[in-house]
């Protein structure tokens, strides 16, 4: 008797949870929701939609976790059309090697644009273009530009995502350049819950010197009708690389 009552109670709880999640799914946010730590996915803001995003990165070197640099970004995104959006970042930073870490300070402005070349699943592989212009707060430093080719292929709830990235100092080739490749796998457990695994590598060239970094890590993304949260950790794979870990969280508010 007790076992039967317990089974009925568990069934009611399960039905209630499924019903609540289904209701949340029907009210999923019209937002640029992130799942990956590093890679951008095939999505832009809907036309006329405004979103506030708060990014927090912890860049931990191999020397000691206390030497980490914390980077905070405040971003406003706006959908110019359903396939083209614009974003403005204000970037702040603090921390670094002990015993003299940098205090909290304004680091840079960044202007970003993204454009989806077609609607989702119209092409064999979804393609999006990304461009970014950065103005460091130190006016003695040159502008920086960044380009991304963003590719995505969906297989039902599963999606494969790849980014090819280039970054340069504007009109200052002597200061070097950076190439990056990101590859991730995303799975939608529920419309409100996604999980992912991601690998990425960066190669920074300055004259004859090359600094290479390799990372692998998991991430999770949850969403409601008004906000979403992404959290992930990338672990350095090469014992000789400078950075040991990247921890990233992004909180988005649909305004």
Predicted feature residues:
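Transmembrane beta-barrel domains of Gram-negative outer membranes and organellar outer membranes
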Residues: 31-254
